Swiss-Prot record:
EC assignment: 5.4.2.10
Organism whose genome encodes this protein: Lactiplantibacillus plantarum (strain ATCC BAA-793 / NCIMB 8826 / WCFS1) (Lactobacillus plantarum)
CC per GO annotation: cytosol
PROSITE patterns the record matches: PGM_PMM (PS00710)
Active-site residues per Swiss-Prot or TrEMBL entry: S103 (phosphoserine intermediate)
Binding site for Mg(2+): S103, D243, D245, D247
Annotated NCBIfam families: glmM
Family of the protein in this entry: Belongs to the phosphohexose mutase family.
Protein name as catalogued: Phosphoglucosamine mutase
EC primary class: isomerase
Length: 451
């Protein structure tokens, strides 16, 4: 697809992703939704939301204008998290939801992501129909002057409904926990205080003052070291860091150690399994999850299923085979019993619930996963597909794997966006992992590398 990537349409705001493009997306998207609407007598309803980056307002106005010109009833949610949109689309009986965000990326980037009425990503077929319309040399879609135009209404109660939903995902409150929260100056900034106060948590916040320019800037789930310091400074038992659009959560234990998505999935998976609530006793992960997670799951008598990198592939696998917990090392964790996508605040609340129920410190809960040292090297290559079929490269990978004898792993995969081959290994020690990666990288460079 030309415009839609795995996470919607992305680009640098106002140059790559322009207001003109947002308007056209609104018109084309609105038209496709109208064509597919089951009930032709009512106007399709679309929820529109954004994160806190300054370009969000510009793109939101343009996108809504496009939707209105195509006859859509728009409910404007304002600033809310991506999983908040996925949830509200379902309960407001909307035909689609649109989130304007570039998630954990820098402030200059922005994106437009569509959700279907079921709260999952819009189907590839519908995205392709939208792309075809965007590629037409001339816009020939209908342009009603009065009857047939859409209307827009603000829907501030969306945030409240979503907050109440999150609070009801656990059976009791979280009193007795001292928490530090990093809102990444993003979409969770205006939610955290309300939710954690309602749940009786004692909490301190940082990075919850968005100014349009400071989203993800040295804070949030991609920079958890900021929260790590804050946790120790405040003497908190646990820290939670979200990203700009609130679909990720990374935790920090009481000592300031970073607890990534792998460890969060293990802790929550084991807890659910012990209560008979983990479907098929299986956790769905991507190939980037650490070997330490698999060893810990195995030791706890749990299974794992692997997918390619990307939270959408995790969700696809979960839906296909009926699993209810999955996610990525980056902190996208999906609790399919509650929501259709990775939800940072939901994940944080579930993790705090496990701490309260077990009475254990986060460092204790996480200690059951021993993370293997990992090294990743990107090699520029002429043809990344051909590199994977090169006999000498295959041979060195096999040699290294044989030497590891199950106490390490190798993953060599092409980059999704650049002419790079990513060479990753995990082993018991830093020395071993460096030696293994260097051996493979030397062969890759000699065979297909370009300087």
């Amino acid at each position: 697809m030309k415009y839609f990537g795995t996470d919607g349409v992305r680009g640098i705001a106002n140059s790559g992703l322009t207001p003109e493009m947002a308007f056209r997306l609104g018109r084309a998207g609105g038209y496709v939704l109208t064509e597919h609407a089951e009930n032709k007598s009512t106007q399709p309803r679309v929820l529109v939301a954004r994160d806190t980056r300054i370009s969000g307002q510009m793109l939101e106005e343009a996108l809504i204008a496009g939707l209105l010109s195509a006859g859509i009833e728009v409910l404007r949610l304002g600033v809310i998290t991506t999983p908040g949109v996925a949830y509200l689309v379902r309960i407001q009986d909307a035909d689609a939801g649109v989130m304007i965000s570039a998630s954990h990326n820098p402030v200059e980037d922005n994106g437009i992501k569509f959700f279907g009425g079921d709260g999952f990503k819009l189907s590839d077929a519908k995205e392709e129909e939208i792309e075809e319309l965007l590629d037409q040399p001339k816009d020939t879609l209908p342009r009603p002057a009065a009857e047939g135009l859409g209307t827009v209404a603000d829907f501030p109660e969306g945030n409240l409904k979503y907050s109440q939903f999150l609070e009801q995902t656990i059976p009791d409150d979280l009193s007795g926990i001292h928490l530090a929260v990093d809102g990444a100056n993003g979409s969770t900034s205006n939610l955290v205080s309300r939710i954690f106060a309602d749940l009786n948590v004692e909490f301190d916040t940082m990075a919850t003052a968005p100014d349009g320019l400071n989203i993800n800037k040295g804070v949030g789930s991609t920079h958890p070291e900021a929260l790590s310091k804050f946790v120790v400074e405040k003497g908190a038992q646990v820290g939670l860091a979200f990203d700009g659009d609130g679909d990720r959560c990374i935790a920090v234990d009481e000592l300031g150690n970073i607890i990534d998505g792998d460890k969060i999935m293990y802790i929550c998976g084991k807890f659910l399994s012990e209560r008979g609530k983990l479907k098929q006793d299986t956790v769905v992960t991507t190939v980037m999850s650490n070997l330490g997670l698999y060893k810990a799951l195995e030791a706890a008598g749990l299974h794992s299923k692997q997918t390619q990198v990307g939270d959408r592939y995790v969700v696809e696998e979960m839906l296909k085979d009926g699993y209810n917990l999955g996610g990525e090392q980056s902190g996208h964790v999906v609790f399919l019993d509650f929501n259709t996508t990775g939800d940072g605040m939901l994940t944080g609340i579930q993790l705090l619930h496990v701490m309260k129920e077990t009475g254990k410190k986060l460092s204790e809960l996480a200690a059951e996963v021993t993370t293997y040292p990992q090294k990743l090297v990107n090699v520029k290559v002429q043809d990344k597909k051909a590199a994977l079929n090169n006999d000498k490269i295959k041979a060195v990978i096999k040699d290294v794997e044989d030497e590891m004898a199950g106490d390490g792993r190798v993953l060599v995969r092409p980059s999704g966006t650049q002419d790079l081959l990513r060479v990753m290994a995990e082993a018991k020690t830093d020395e071993l992992v460096s030696a293994y990666v260097d051996r493979i990288v030397d062969v890759v460079k000699a065979e297909v590398g370009i300087e």
